[in-house]
Amino acid sequence: MITKEDIVADVVTDYPKSADIFRNAGIDFCCGGQESIASAVNHKPNIDLNSLLNKLNHIDNTEGNSTINPKFLNVESLIQYIQSAYHETLKEEFKNLTPYMTKLAKVHGPSHPYLLKLQDLYREFRDSMLDHIRKEDEEDFPKLIQYSQGQDVQNIKIILEDLINDHEDTGQLLNVMNQLTSDYQTPEEACGTWKLVYQRLQNIERQTHQHVHLENHVLFKKVS
């Protein structure tokens, strides 16, 4: 049973579908997930604690029971899971989405200047994430695996702190894009490309929150 004393990030780790409930309540389970549910709700005057707990305790986890629970993977297997589920898919999505983002800004940017700003933010987010993923795959993750196997790795705490700081910067960029688009609500005049871009940006946001949660609150805990 999930209680008000449970830590938000731990709940998402054990019950992945709870991420949607926390997201809808505006509760950060990613970079700010290390607080109790009660404490998180205290910052949200429009959220009823008992109602939230009721929703959390009625999560249907039948689908999750048949899938991998990353919590029980060792460090090397967990890293492989992260790379397959998030790194590779995100790189592919950036490749596919960028032409649509370019088209949207070119066609509708002159009459809707905030779309030009959105394009700049998207490019910044894309480039920083690609660089971050490359660094993790080529430099940081191999060191985490070595450390988990008992090998001597210098400055492991600094490595983790740097990665967490990168994640916080990523979260801030996502928040700015979310605010700029009013939580990806398209206007009435939005064309198909506009709707497509917003939908896929929103999906990237959700996937990135889950991605960062898995690294910050599961992987890094295993090696800290």
From Swiss-Prot:
One annotated GO molecular function: metal ion binding
GO biological process terms held by the UniProt record: protein repair; response to nitrosative stress; response to oxidative stress
One Pfam family matching this protein: ScdA_N
One GO term describing the cellular component: cytoplasm
Subcellular location: Cytoplasm
Top-level lineage group: Bacteria
Keyword list, A-Z: Cytoplasm, Iron, Metal-binding, Stress response
Keyword Cytoplasm among UniProt keywords: yes
Known role: Di-iron-containing protein involved in the repair of iron-sulfur clusters damaged by oxidative and nitrosative stress conditions.
Subunit structure, interactors included: Homodimer.
Listed PANTHER family: IRON-SULFUR CLUSTER REPAIR PROTEIN YTFE
Family membership noted in the UniProt record: Belongs to the RIC family. ScdA subfamily.
This protein's name: Iron-sulfur cluster repair protein ScdA
Organism from which the protein derives: Staphylococcus epidermidis (strain ATCC 35984 / DSM 28319 / BCRC 17069 / CCUG 31568 / BM 3577 / RP62A)
Lineage: Bacteria, Bacillati, Bacillota, Bacilli, Bacillales
Gene name for this UniProt entry: scdA
